[in-house]
């Protein structure tokens, strides 16, 4: 192999097998895709050690992808349950899965996840550091943090989320500009705490070149985390968020110089009117790098329904430039999600992603909707079920409330507009009073 990373190959004009697969999925010319990868506008996260990977592209002109979060916590330490969630995410065709395990020895779960998953796998190494070393956070050294990142890369993680932009300058901006919710990023808060407790620079910022060595060695995509993402609508688009984003833009250029692919992580909580502006700011400051957003969650008052608040924000964000949506479940802000929560979150995120693809004019996006429109006009219920984003639910709802007429539903019965227009245009009687058809 005469290249180190997907970006290195693209710059050299080499079409990798991963590029070929992604181009076929996206129905685009592979040379056009290669050009986007070479410029950092598209990332293809593909660790050399992730042998079961079915690669996907994230970025400009491609379908909007979704990510599913899962992982072990201290209160819910159940590897088998988390592996069930992995299978659920795979079955529902999530393009990416992030292991957010944050307690104990996590390598066994991480390796099993990577071995079984065709989806892109992301991790957050700092979550693992305390358990990895059995040390208090403040006692972990800069070199030890980097060693944990290398272990995750060696295990086969396709992208690593690392909050490199939480440097001393960003921290100073945060201190000067108080927030209602402080720092709500788990990884960002851990790094900020470590920096304060040790009076030192962010180890990943200070050791960024070493981090790039790791990413280049394993072809790991660097997902630059947003430590200062807003945790409530009052904190959105503030000085801390923008200061960090400026730093991430500078770090992006350094990574690209080393042929390391980059994804930028983004907000967060914000009102509808701020979303488009935030997408444009990120694309400008971070040089068109793919944008990965959590939500955005557009109101803070809906615990139990944040899959909806997130889908609303995600659809708008992706319409205006976001490339990758992190799912949010009904359990957000309340507890670890279960399998039912996962399903709701995945479907909500997929709806948001697809709605945005329609708005952006992504090639082929309308084909699905056009097929559904034809099935509905034909009153082909079986085809409607097959095309439904949640086939099981669609079938169950119809089965639970059966119409007397086979070509209508219990909402309208024989007053169904589609049925009656079909019959009239075919020269047939409506037969409104009989139950035989």
From Swiss-Prot:
The record describes the protein's role as:
Catalyzes the synthesis of the hydroxymethylpyrimidine phosphate (HMP-P) moiety of thiamine from aminoimidazole ribotide (AIR) in a radical S-adenosyl-L-methionine (SAM)-dependent reaction.
The UniProt family comment states: Belongs to the ThiC family.
What is the protein name stated in its UniProt record? Phosphomethylpyrimidine synthase
Reactions performed catalytically: 5-amino-1-(5-phospho-beta-D-ribosyl)imidazole + S-adenosyl-L-methionine = 4-amino-2-methyl-5-(phosphooxymethyl)pyrimidine + CO + 5'-deoxyadenosine + formate + L-methionine + 3 H(+)
Keywords, alphabetical = 4Fe-4S, Iron, Iron-sulfur, Lyase, Metal-binding, S-adenosyl-L-methionine, Thiamine biosynthesis, Zinc
Which GO molecular function terms does the record list? 4 iron, 4 sulfur cluster binding; carbon-carbon lyase activity; zinc ion binding
| rRNA processing in keyword set | no
Task: Provide the taxonomic classification.
Answer: Bacteria, Bacillati, Bacillota, Clostridia, Eubacteriales
């Amino acid at each position: 192999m005469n290249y180190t990373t997907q970006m290195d190959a693209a710059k050299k004009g080499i079409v990798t097998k991963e590029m070929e697969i992604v181009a076929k999925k996206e129905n685009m010319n592979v040379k056009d895709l290669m050009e986007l990868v070479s410029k950092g506008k598209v990332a293809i996260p593909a660790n050399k050690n992730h042998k079961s990977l079915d690669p996907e592209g994230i970025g400009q002109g491609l379908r909007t992808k979704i990510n599913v979060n899962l992982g072990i916590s201290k209160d819910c330490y159940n590897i088998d349950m988390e592996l069930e969630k992995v299978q659920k995410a795979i079955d529902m065709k999530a393009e990416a899965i992030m292991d957010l395990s944050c307690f104990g020895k996590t390598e066994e779960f991480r390796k099993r996840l990577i071995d079984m998953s065709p989806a892109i796998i992301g991790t957050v190494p700092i979550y693992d550091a305390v358990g990895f070393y059995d040390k208090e956070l403040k006692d972990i050294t800069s070199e030890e943090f980097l060693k944990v990142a290398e272990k995750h890369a060696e295990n086969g993680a396709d992208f690593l989320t690392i909050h490199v932009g939480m440097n001393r300058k960003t921290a100073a901006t945060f201190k000067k500009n108080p927030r209602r919710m402080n720092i709500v990023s788990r990884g960002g808060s851990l790094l900020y705490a470590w920096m304060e407790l040790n009076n030192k620079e962010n180890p990943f910022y200070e050791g960024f070149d070493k981090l790039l060595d790791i990413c280049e060695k394993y072809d790991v995509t660097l997902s630059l985390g947003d430590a200062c993402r807003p945790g409530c609508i009052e904190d959105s688009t503030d000085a801390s968020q923008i200061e960090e984003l400026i730093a991430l833009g500078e770090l992006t250029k350094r990574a690209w110089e080393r042929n390391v692919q980059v994804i930028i992580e983004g907000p967060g909580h914000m009102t509808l009117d701020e979303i488009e502006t935030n997408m444009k700011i990120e694309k400008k400051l971070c040089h068109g790098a793919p944008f990965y957003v959590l939500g955005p969650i557009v109101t803070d008052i809906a615990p139990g329904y944040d899959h909806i608040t997130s889908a609303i924000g995600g659809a708008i964000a992706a319409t205006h430039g976001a490339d990758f949506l992190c799912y949010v479940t009904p359990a957000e802000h309340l507890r670890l999600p279960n399998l039912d929560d996962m399903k709701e979150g995945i479907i909500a995120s997929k709806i948001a992603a697809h709605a945005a693809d329609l708005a952006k004019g992504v090639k082929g996006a309308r084909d699905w909707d056009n097929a559904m429109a034809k099935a509905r006009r034909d009153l082909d219920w079986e085809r409607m079920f097959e095309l439904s984003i949640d086939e099981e639910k669609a079938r169950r709802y119809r089965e639970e409330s059966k119409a007397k007429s086979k070509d209508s539903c219990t909402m309208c019965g024989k007053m169904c507009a589609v049925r009656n227009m079909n019959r009239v245009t075919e020269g047939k009687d409506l037969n409104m009073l009989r139950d035989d058809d």
